[in-house]
Amino acid sequence: MELGVKVVFIKEKKYVPQLGTFTMFEIPTGNYSKGLGVGKVWYKVPIWLQKNSGHWTLDGGAGYQVVPQTGYRNFPYTGWLVKRTLGSRLELGVELFAHAREGYAAPQTQASTMIDLGGYYHFKHHGEQFLFAYGHSIAGQTENYAYVGLYWTWGSDGKGNSAGVRWTGVNGSELEWQ
């Protein structure tokens, strides 16, 4: 399970991108002794930029992942996303994402750069979405992933809506408060 808090340091203006962090806490839900998960809480600490222009969003930055478990490593990562809003319900994006070695116990023992495609479908009830993504490595260790999920958010999106939604990164869901 993933929980996160978005903190904005500089708000987006006409010629200035938003600057902030989206600190994530990965809560263990699997049985570590059976190879299901890391077995401890681990963290993502990024610095992110975001700029909107009409139906387009550019989003990117870099961060550091802290994984306090034997056999895993702390490592840097970076990513850049281009997203397009198509109507009131659908968002599609393409992302370039790279990470360093994650440790010998992780599936990703070497560095990798991936390209992924994905998006959100927003249901009628605000704050409920269907997420989907597929990614494959283009450099480094071979990686392949597919993701589908249901996503619930709460909080304010700064526009008077009861839930805030932003797609900010790789491999699926994140919670956001603004």
List the predicted regions and their residue ranges.
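Hydrophobic, lipid-facing positions within transmembrane beta-strands of outer-membrane proteins
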Residues: 1-5, 19, 41-47, 76-80, ...
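N-terminal short leaders/motifs
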Residues: 1-7, 35, 78, 84-85, ...
